[in-house]
Amino acid sequence: MTFLDALPDSDEEFRQLAQTWLHDNVVGKFAELKGRGGPGDEDIGFDIRVAWEKALGHAGWIGLGWPTQFGGRGASVSKQMIWAQEYTLAQAPARVNHMGEHLLGPTLIEYGTPEQCTRFLPGILSGDERWCQGYSEPNAGSDLANVQTKAQLDGDEWIINGQKVWTSLAHVSQWCFVVVRTEQDSKRHKGLTFLLVPMDQSGVEVRPIVQITGGGEFNETFFTNARTGIDMVVGTPGNGWSVAMGLLGLERGISTLAQQIGFERELDNVIALARSNSAIMRPVIRQRVVQSWIGMQLMKWNALRSMSGGVPGPEASISKLFWGTWHRGLGELTMDVLGVESTVMPDSEYSLEQKLFLFTRADTIYGGSNEVQRNILGERVLGLPKEPT
């Protein structure tokens, strides 16, 4: 029996429930990670954050919005928003399985077989199994349709060869969902398949990529005759593009809700910093702080609108375009609030504020660049002609 076996009907009762649980549980070693684990700081206290993930799962806080028949809580959009708000206010530890809960889980619910759901959803809900995403390649980043990693059937197994890059948390994940090319003469979107691949095997090599912040969240992942079962295809062979795009819609659609947990914390820290060093007294800084706060509120409203409409479609690109630009701007604002201190490394590593600035330089690129998002919106939402090639 979990803490959340029965959700209260009232949003206010639910808020009180969330507040009470977070107050009682963000203590001890978990309280030591308050405000940590954000951009450029992902390696901090990882073992503690894994334990926190399991605590969330044991109490029933993972999969709040999943349908009850799949082990979720069937929580309304408003309750999911309340949980995000209270999580932020409690400064609870940063999550380690966003990929599993918010991306793969809903994708399996939408496209997976009953056997796949039975096998994988409980591990996500309990916090016991972590997932990473194998999409980008050296020559297939924003142009994802150029995937070159291949998989061939060998009896009842797929044999996978190729390379993925920018694989977040691959070094600490047990499974990876991978887009591969299974029809060898196919081009672009055709002939792709969505596979679930175990990471703990000799055919998978993970090499960390040291970022400009000094952190190592991202990795190169090499598949050399790696294997996975024939039953590990999500959807059907050759139709992986549709599954991958459905997942990207979830990523870009829920990101303004899930990521706002960290965003609000960062904005609060910037405001506190501006007050403490009197930067808030400068009219330009004060105006930019207000603009950032307004942007945060707009992202919340857009998240509610996106989630209330069911599975996000191409309009989810609005979310990615919005938060990528907003977050990069927050990093720039942080440096201006710091002033000349922003150019000096205080110790052997960058400060959290400097890490935020350095990390957010990539926000308008990864997960689909701003240029790609504008093309999607122009072509699929506004009906404009495709960009000439």
Residue ranges and their predicted role:
Residues 96-115, 141:
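N-terminal glycine-rich flavin-associated loop
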Residues 149-152:
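A structural signal for short hydrophobic beta-strand segments in well-ordered beta-sheet cores
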Residues 127-135:
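A short, Trp-centered hydrophobic/proline-enriched beta-strand micro-motif
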Residues 3-4, 78, 82-83, 94, ...:
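Glycine-rich phosphate/cofactor-binding loops in nucleotide/flavin-utilizing enzymes
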Residues 3-7, 13-14, 204-301, 363:
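Glycine-rich beta->alpha junctions and the first turn(s) of the following alpha-helix
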Residues 156-157, 161-207:
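A short core secondary-structure module
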Residues 1-98, 119-126, 269, 276, ...:
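Amphipathic, small/basic residue-rich leader segments at the start of a protein or domain
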